[in-house]
């Protein structure tokens, strides 16, 4: 029986002054263990989602944890039948998740971590302001009951949204969440710096919550967007029914794919009347490459660009 592929989302805020020198040995460790996916490293830490065999993932985690600075690196796992990534990359970054505000450092100041088992009680408190720190296309797939959607298109927009809508003197308790924990952890550091006193964030993010909290007790509604070719996962962490439009990158549902405006790899109901001719031509060419690669039983030569550049778990 074929063993399922293990998908591991991992991150840790930790000072890595030698991060530039870490790139090549980390990349070699990924190659040696047969790992696909992308890891981002910066002076503030490491972040990314990777996939491989059980032995391969364990080997990579052992390599990382051999460094005393990463012995407690956070990671969440799920499984799939097909390889969700086509390439193996380690990228050097200024930030492992881009907020774009100087001085925000979760290594120095961070909110209160909340375990998944305690999350329901916290967000049931009427005095708690619950904010989804993810982008609009992610929130549209699923979110927690009662969560505020900032309707941001990138994490860089989050600080301005907070300044325009909330006041530390009025909003005394704030709880935030994201896919794997990294965005809300950095957001908590930012909000503490802005004067918010009680700031909480979901430890391990939505993925850890779905893993640990039974469906009969859940306050989660819908699927969870993930940054790989699965597009979404259900509450049991199995692959969801969404695809993703290669032209506009929006997740598309079963209903969307039944629309007359949906053309696989080229357009969807969300973008069919707004695409530039250049984007449309590019999508058509990319789809031809994908179909040719599939016919030859080869990985897509340029990969699916599933907004992975952000890798914002």
From Swiss-Prot:
| Keyword tRNA processing attributed | yes
Q: Which InterPro entries match?
A: Rhodanese-like_dom (IPR001763), Rhodanese-like_dom_sf (IPR036873), TrhO (IPR020936), TRHO_N (IPR040503)
Q: Which PROSITE patterns match?
A: RHODANESE_3
**Gene3D superfamilies, sorted:** 3.30.70.100, Rhodanese-like domain (3.40.250.10)
Name the chemical reaction catalysed here.
uridine(34) in tRNA + AH2 + O2 = 5-hydroxyuridine(34) in tRNA + A + H2O
Please give the start and end residues of each transmembrane region: none
Active-site residues, record numbering mapped to chain: 178
Keywords on this record? Oxidoreductase, tRNA processing
Gene Ontology terms describing biological process: tRNA modification
Molecular function per GO: oxidoreductase activity, acting on paired donors, with incorporation or reduction of molecular oxygen
Q: In the Enzyme Commission scheme, what number(s) does this protein have?
A: 1.14.-.-
Q: Can you tell which superkingdom this protein's organism belongs to? A: Bacteria
Q: What does this protein do?
A: Catalyzes oxygen-dependent 5-hydroxyuridine (ho5U) modification at position 34 in tRNAs.
Tell me the HAMAP family matching this sequence.
Answer: TrhO
What family, per the record? Belongs to the TrhO family.
Name of the featured protein? tRNA uridine(34) hydroxylase
The beginning of the lineage is: Bacteria, Pseudomonadati, Pseudomonadota, Gammaproteobacteria, Pseudomonadales
Q: Identify the coding gene.
A: trhO
């Amino acid at each position: 029986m074929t063993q399922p592929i293990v998908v591991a989302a991992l991150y840790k805020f930790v000072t890595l002054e030698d991060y530039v020198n870490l790139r090549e040995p980390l990349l070699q460790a990924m190659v040696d263990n047969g790992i696909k996916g992308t890891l981002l490293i910066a002076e503030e830490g490491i972040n990314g989602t990777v996939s491989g065999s059980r032995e391969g993932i364990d080997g990579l985690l052992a390599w990382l944890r051999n460094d005393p600075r990463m012995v407690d690196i956070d990671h969440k796992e799920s499984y799939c039948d097909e390889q969700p990534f086509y390439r193996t990359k380690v990228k050097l970054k200024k930030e492992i998740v881009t907020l774009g505000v100087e001085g925000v450092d979760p290594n120095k100041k961070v909110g209160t971590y909340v375990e998944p088992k305690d999350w329901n009680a916290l967000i049931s408190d009427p005095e708690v302001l619950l904010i989804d720190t993810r982008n609009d296309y992610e929130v549209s797939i699923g979110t927690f009951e009662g969560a505020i959607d900032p309707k941001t298109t990138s994490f860089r927009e989050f600080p301005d949204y907070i300044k325009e809508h909330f006041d530390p003197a009025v909003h005394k308790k704030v709880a935030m969440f994201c896919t794997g924990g990294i965005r809300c952890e950095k957001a908590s550091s930012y909000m503490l710096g802005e004067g918010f006193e009680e700031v909480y964030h979901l430890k391990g993010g939505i993925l850890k919550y779905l893993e640990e909290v039974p469906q009969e007790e859940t306050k989660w509604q819908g699927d969870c967007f993930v940054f790989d070719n699965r597009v979404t996962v259900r509450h049991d962490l199995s692959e969801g029914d969404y695809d993703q439009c290669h032209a506009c990158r929006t997740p598309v549902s079963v209903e969307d794919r039944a629309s007359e405006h949906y053309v696989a790899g080229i357009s969807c109901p969300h973008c069919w009347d707004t695409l530039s001719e250049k984007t449309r031509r590019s999508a058509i060419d990319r789809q031809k490459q994908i179909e040719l690669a599939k016919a030859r039983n080869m990985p897509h030569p340029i990969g699916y660009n599933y907004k992975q550049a952000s890798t914002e778990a």
